[in-house]
Amino acid sequence: MREIVHLQTGQCGNQIGAAFWQTISGEHGLDSNGVYNGTSELQLERMSVYFNEASGNKYVPRAVLVDLEPGTMDAVRAGPFGQLFRPDNFVFGQSGAGNNWAKGHYTEGAELVDNVLDVVRREAEGCDCLQGFQITHSLGGGTGAGMGTLLISKIREEFPDRMMATFSVVPSPKVSDTVVEPYNATLSVHQLVENSDETFCIDNEALYDICMRTLKLSNPSYGDLNYLVSAVMSGVTTCLRFPGQLNSDLRKLAVNMVPFPRLHFFMVGFAPLTSRGAHSFRAVSVPELTQQMFDPKNMMAASDFRNGRYLTCSAIFRGKVAMKEVEDQMRNVQNKNSSYFVEWIPNNIQTALCAIPPRGLKMSSTFIGNSTSIQELFKRVGEQFTAMFRRKAFLHWYTGEGMDEMEFTEAESNMNDLVSEYQQYQDAGVDEEEEEYDEEAPVEEPLE
């Protein structure tokens, strides 16, 4: 089977990770101790993608939990699914990274990273055919951002041919946890551009908006936000966990979604959106799901795709869905909104179907889009970065851990390059490209 090893780093990563494991344990018929008491063969068939079978019908997540302070781990352990995880797979320090990327990446995190890699190695050795890794973390803090990206590059070194997917919580414009978020995020993006194969961007503000506007929750808790994220993560990984007519795995997803290696930052969405307690029991149809799924209000990253164009997107439908209906709807979306899709990638929507819906729903859909409008997000962080960096504000916290200002300058320019690459492909048309071909062809696509 094609196994995936899951890592969660830092407070945010561990909380999202815990929600994810809770969601998929439920879908696979596991109780909070990992004992199987489900009803369907399909739940068992691909259990091994995310779970190891231990003795006595018990399944253990292939998860590595990492943090630089014990607090969040204790919370996970004391939570409803705390007994699910293998105790040796909790790796934590005592000092904390204090929202400082340099501590996570160079000092505190670097001391712990070998212990984490030992656990990762052990998990990888327990796999038949490892497909890749997924990591949940935030980009604004110290541990998730600094140590998370350190782990990604170390794992990259050791498993160069395996996929690396990240679920990254990006700082949001209105909801800020720390002043130095722009620094941490820029330094992290600098790493992700080089070392990740696919990054699913999630941001708290967009999640807040969904909770307030769509779910009508007056003051959403992080629990509600994490529930939304886990719904998306469950959707993105459906095809890996259940047999379906049109399956995709991490690599297929990347092949279909990433037209140029650096442009692998995706927006995600989910439909139908329901709050944690109230699963609406009204029937949803494929057209409704499609319409909801492509609605900017449903996107979990604060950038509006109407300001850019889709390079590619992927839609994953779950439940009793007619294949033909999905195809028709997708064609429909593309024809009606052709201005939002680049015309130089024909048929740029990939669809996948899975017969098993999430718990409490008849059908659902998950949306993954590679849109040039994601540059808004990087632009926003970049502007905040520049404002502080110009005055060298807060820099001493980073240089004190042995970082060089040069590294900040590099990260800044790498992110600015990323923004202009997105812009370049947004503006590119089929007709204008003819003249540019002479200089560009060898650089972009060296033909075999």
Swiss-Prot record:
CDD domains, per the entry: beta_tubulin
Entry keyword annotation includes Metal-binding: yes
Gene3D superfamilies assigned to the protein according to its UniProt record, in alphabetical order: Helix hairpin bin, Tubulin/FtsZ, C-terminal domain, Tubulin/FtsZ, GTPase domain
Record-annotated disulphide pairs: none
Short name of one Pfam family: Tubulin
Keywords, comma-separated and alphabetical: Cytoplasm, Cytoskeleton, GTP-binding, Magnesium, Metal-binding, Microtubule, Nucleotide-binding
Binding of GTP, residues: Q11, E69, S138, G142, T143, G144, N204, N226
MF (Gene Ontology): GTP binding; GTPase activity; metal ion binding; structural constituent of cytoskeleton
Annotated region described as Disordered, given as residue ranges: 425-448
Keyword Cytoplasm set for record: yes
GO biological process: microtubule-based process
Biased composition (Acidic residues): 429-448
Required cofactor(s): Mg(2+)
Subcellular location(s) per record: Cytoplasm, Cytoskeleton
GO cellular component, one term: microtubule
Binding site for Mg(2+): E69
Family the UniProt entry places it in: Belongs to the tubulin family.
Function: Tubulin is the major constituent of microtubules, a cylinder consisting of laterally associated linear protofilaments composed of alpha- and beta-tubulin heterodimers. Microtubules grow by the addition of GTP-tubulin dimers to the microtubule end, where a stabilizing cap forms. Below the cap, tubulin dimers are in GDP-bound state, owing to GTPase activity of alpha-tubulin.
Binding partners and assembly: Dimer of alpha and beta chains. A typical microtubule is a hollow water-filled tube with an outer diameter of 25 nm and an inner diameter of 15 nM. Alpha-beta heterodimers associate head-to-tail to form protofilaments running lengthwise along the microtubule wall with the beta-tubulin subunit facing the microtubule plus end conferring a structural polarity. Microtubules usually have 13 protofilaments but different protofilament numbers can be found in some organisms and specialized cells.
Protein name: Tubulin beta chain
Biological source species: Metarhizium anisopliae
Upper lineage: Eukaryota, Fungi, Dikarya, Ascomycota, Pezizomycotina
